[in-house]
Amino acid sequence: SNRTSKNEMRELFPESASFGTPKPERLIERIMRLSTDPGDWVLDSFAGSGTTGAVAHKMGRRWIMVELGEHCHTHIIPRLKKVIDGEDKGGITEAVDWKGGGGFRYYHLAPSLLEKDKWGNWVINKAYNPAMLAQAVCKLEGFVYAPSDTSYWQQGHSTERDFIYVTT
């Protein structure tokens, strides 16, 4: 029930405000048992409090979570650290004999490279500084972004003889 999941969140984060609509770990576990096998990928594109990722991790599934709000910092990252460290004793931990382990990577997406100006023309986003622009162009053109310490014009490379220089 929703009450169960709120209690799970209070155990994990006694000092912070409860998340508005957490899902109980047992519900997510049941859905995953019916639809996935260990090692499968689970995607939660509205991660919220991180329940799906926590359950997937405890059940030996690989997972991707996406969250645009601050929940990443207030709930998801601290929660997953507790799962990995074996400090999360609630939810399905006992049922799946979870002891801790594993890890995760956190990525922060950059703003969109292009935006429309007031006339509707596509222009480089003002949020990009020259280094960010060079990195984005390297990525788009298949170069490795690796600015040289000795040559200003070598911001990236694709081979030993192919270099890229991006100017603004």
Go through the PLM ranges and name each one.
Residues D40-S45:
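Conserved class I S-adenosyl-L-methionine
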